[in-house]
Amino acid sequence: MARVTVEDCIEKIPNRFRLVLMAAHRARNISAGSELTIDRDNDKNPVVALREIADETLDMDSLKDSLVNGLQRVLPSEDEEDAAREERGQQMEALPAPPVELDEAEMLKALQNDRDGAPDGRL
C-alpha cells in the first residue's frame, strides 16, 4: 500500500492535535491486543492506526470515547477524603507514646544496665 500521509488523515480528522491523540490511542490499543480492521502489511502499529483512520474502518465516536475515558482522572469525593482523614487520625492514636525524657542519673543507670546485661524485661 502507498505511504500514509498526514494529509490523508487530515481529511477525516481536521485537527492535527486530535489526529495525533486518536492515532496514538489506537496504536496503544493495537499493542494491547485490539483487533485490526485492515491488513497489517508488515507495518508498525502507528502506521496501521493511521491507515485505519484514513480508510475510515474505525468507529471514530467509540475511539474518541475510549480516548476521553483513558485521559480522565477520577478525583476522590469529599466523603472519601473525610473517611481517609478520619482513618489516618485513628492510626495516629494507635501509635505508641513518645519516649519518656530521662534525667542524667536515670540515663546513666539504664546505660550501665545495658552494658552489664541486667535483665530489664526486653527480648
UniProtKB/Swiss-Prot annotation:
Pfam families: RNA_pol_Rpb6
Keyword entries, A-Z: DNA-directed RNA polymerase, Nucleotidyltransferase, Transcription, Transferase
Catalyzed reactions per annotation: RNA(n) + a ribonucleoside 5'-triphosphate = RNA(n+1) + diphosphate
GO cellular component: DNA-directed RNA polymerase complex
One GO-annotated biological process of the protein: DNA-templated transcription
Region annotation (Disordered) ranges: 72-100
GO MF, one example: DNA-directed RNA polymerase activity
Enzyme class: transferase
Gene3D superfamilies recorded: 3.90.940.10
EC number of the protein: 2.7.7.6
InterPro entries according to UniProt: DNA-dir_RNA_pol_omega, Pol_omega/Rpo6/RPB6, RPB6/omega-like_sf
Keyword ATP-binding assigned: no
Family (UniProt): Belongs to the RNA polymerase subunit omega family.
Subunit structure: The RNAP catalytic core consists of 2 alpha, 1 beta, 1 beta' and 1 omega subunit. When a sigma factor is associated with the core the holoenzyme is formed, which can initiate transcription.
Its biological purpose: Promotes RNA polymerase assembly. Latches the N- and C-terminal regions of the beta' subunit thereby facilitating its interaction with the beta and alpha subunits.
PANTHER family per record: DNA-DIRECTED RNA POLYMERASE SUBUNIT OMEGA (PTHR34476:SF1)
Name the record gives this protein: DNA-directed RNA polymerase subunit omega
Organism the protein comes from: Maricaulis maris (strain MCS10)
Gene: rpoZ
